[in-house]
Design a protein with these regions (language model features):
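Short loop/turn motifs at secondary-structure junctions and domain boundaries
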Residues: 90-95
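Sensory-domain boundary capping and coupling elements
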Residues: 103-117
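Short amphipathic alpha-helical segments
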Residues: 2-15, 129
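Regulatory sensory and allosteric helical modules in signal-transduction proteins
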Residues: 44-85
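Regulatory loop-to-helix N-cap segments in sensory/regulatory domains
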Residues: 117-134, 143-144
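Short, hydrophobic-rich beta-strand element in sensory/regulatory alpha-beta domains
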Residues: 10-14, 19-34, 74
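GAF sensory/regulatory domain recognition
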Residues: 23-52
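A short, aliphatic-rich beta-strand micro-motif
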Residues: 96-104
Length: 144
């Protein structure tokens, strides 16, 4: 996958949501593999990859990932601290609100895009979820 495609996609997603931290994780061998994210002052790429490397996230052990890989639909959480679906990794990165978009190929979730609001809450709207999902489909249609 070309990083330039993700850079363009993430720019569009940030414009739609006003949220700057956007990351792409592949799902391989039953776990998240961080691939690329936006470089922000809040959470840089190297820190993101290092923390994920030290704290692997397995689909089978993470309720919200099991839900996404089963339903194959975007999910949003407004308040991660008070939502039982929240993953431990959300707290490692200080995520307050999150939208997760599955990248589905041949009826299987191959990757996820996380749009993470860090340091403030963000109410992701139905329109934002639909627009971001369509953008992801359009930009990533020839990937995998």
């Amino acid at each position: 996958m070309e990083v330039t495609i993700l850079e363009e996609l993430f720019q569009k997603i940030s414009e739609v949501t006003t949220v700057g931290d956007v990351g792409y994780h592949r799902i391989e061998e039953g776990r998240l593999k961080p691939f690329y994210k936006t470089q922000t002052d809040i959470l840089g790429i190297e820190k993101w990859k290092t923390v994920h490397g030290q704290n692997p996230v397995y689909v089978k052990d993470t309720f919200i990932l099991r839900e996404i890989t089963t339903k194959k639909q975007p999910i949003e959480i407004y308040d991660t601290k008070n939502d039982t679906r929240s993953a431990d990794a959300f707290f490692l990165f200080g995520i307050d609100s999150i939208m997760i978009i599955p990248v589905v190929r041949e009826d299987e979730v191959k990757a996820i895009i996380c749009i993470a609001s860090i340091g403030k809450y963000h109410q992701f709207t139905k329109e934002e979820m639909e627009t971001c999902s369509k953008l992801a489909d359009d930009y990533l249609k020839n990937q995998y």
